[in-house]
């Protein structure tokens, strides 16, 4: 099993913990993510329509592999409340091989 380019973290910001939980539950239930981690409260500072925003958001991190990521991204876009959701695909360059095997086995 090659680690490079096979496993990914999906980094997603959501409007609140409930939205993150809904997306995570659905993704894991549909075997598109092995697991999700939710950071319930963080502060996000950004510009939207040229206006400075300072919002409370939640962070959702989902663990997946290359074959499941396209469907996972599609699901997030469909379930997300934002007009332009933050969805970032972060490659996992290395990790505990047993854990990475568990990710793969969980996505079957």
What annotation goes with each model-predicted range?
Residues 1-108:
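Positively charged, small/polar-rich N-terminal and surface patches that mediate targeting and assembly
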């Amino acid at each position: 099993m090659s680690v490079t380019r096979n496993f990914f973290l999906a980094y997603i910001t959501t409007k609140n913990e409930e939205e993150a939980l809904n997306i995570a539950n659905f993704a894991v239930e549909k075997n598109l993510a092995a697991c999700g981690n939710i950071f319930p409260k963080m502060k996000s500072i950004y510009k939207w329509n040229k206006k400075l925003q300072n919002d409370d958001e939640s962070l959702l991190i989902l663990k997946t592999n290359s074959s499941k990521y396209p469907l996972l991204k599609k699901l997030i876009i469909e379930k997300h409340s934002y007009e332009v959701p933050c969805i970032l695909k972060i490659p996992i360059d290395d990790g505990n091989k047993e854990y990475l095997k568990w990710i793969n086995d969980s996505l079957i």
